Amino acid sequence: MLDQLELQSGFARRWLLDSSLMTADEDITRCYDVLHRFFDFVEKVDKTRLDTLLFKLQGLKDIRTTIKNLHNHATLDDIELFEVKHLAILATDVARLLHEHEMDRVVEIPALDEVISILDPDGMKIATFYIYDSYCAQLKELRARMRQHPEQQDDLMLEAGELEEGVRKDLSLQLHPFATAVEQAQIALACIDVNLAKAMQMR
């Protein structure tokens, strides 16, 4: 039966397989209540909105290693910072879609607006990561000098690299308090993916 579930993300499948078997009556009841709400949702929602939600869930990736590093006060690299930003934007988009149909309290997704603000200083809401000039005035000035004086590239690039690493360290420190919320958001999205797949299988 699990193999027949049309899950949108590989992480949701791993999360489902790793989940402990429920034995407490209240947990089982809660699980069926959630599934019932998702069944009603897929029956009533228009196909375009459902397809949009399913498509977004395809973007859910397994970033548990990154989250572990964030918990452990590690300085995240550019790829890890991208993963956190991507998840935060994805979680916010999915939460908004569910809120439109009063489904946001069925599976609650932690608010990650502050995470987005930290990683998206220019407010572009694009799920890519780059050490923007907005992070550091000194870095902005240095990059301008690099464009104006290409003959000094080697020395200036070394200095820029040191400044960029400082930005990564600062961003990681700012993000650390949100490590648990990011982790919970990843799990919530997997739960939504699983329940949607089960609900569609029941149709």
Name each region found by the language model:
Residues 65, 89-96, 116-203:
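Conserved P-loop NTPase architecture
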Residues 1-138, 142:
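Conserved amphipathic alpha-helical "coupling/scaffold" segments
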